[in-house]
Design a protein with these regions (language model features):
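Contiguous, glycine/small-aliphatic-enriched amphipathic segments in soluble metabolic enzymes
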Residues: 1-135
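Flexible loop/hinge segments that line or gate small-molecule binding clefts
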Residues: 130-152
């Protein structure tokens, strides 16, 4: 019996930014969406956000009715809304790489990147890419890149 397509992986983006708030709001509209999960630190979610920590993306669909499925990726230090922390840079980059690996393995059907703070990544980890698109191309071993935006 098929369990349906793999869920979509959401990267947390910059914890001090709007990414975790977007993910929390998306959970409230979950009936309109295919299964998804957030990769990040559940401590960074807005206060009161229902969530379920999952060990693997295969648990996302079952967790989704009860709370935002979060594949735990612990960060050092606290989230300070509006104040990007260069100390979080390596963990943010690792979340993106983890999402790519899960997508390439088939554990996630796609990935959606939430906003990063490019200067914090450069200052904190020497991030050598102009943004997500070029880093994703690098991880996928591609030279040519295209960015797609969807506004609903």
């Amino acid at each position: 019996m098929s369990q349906g397509p793999a869920p979509i992986a959401l990267t947390c983006g910059e914890p001090a930014g709007v990414g975790v708030e977007i993910a929390a709001k998306l959970w409230h509209r979950r009936a309109e969406c295919p299964p998804f999960f957030l990769i990040g630190d559940p401590r960074h979610l807005p206060a009161g956000t229902p969530h379920r920590v999952i060990a693997h993306p295969t648990e996302a669909a079952a967790a989704l009715p009860h709370g935002l499925p979060v594949l735990d990726h612990p960060f050092d230090g606290a989230r300070v809304p509006g104040l990007p922390q260069p100390a979080h840079a390596a963990q943010i980059i690792a979340v993106i790489a983890r999402a790519v690996a899960l997508t390439q393995s088939g554990a996630a059907s796609a990935l959606c990147t939430l906003p990063i703070h490019k200067k914090a990544l450069k200052d904190g980890a020497g991030f050598a890419f102009p943004g997500h698109t070029e880093y994703l191309a690098h991880l996928a071993g591609q030279r040519d890149v295209v960015m797609m935006l969807h506004l609903a």
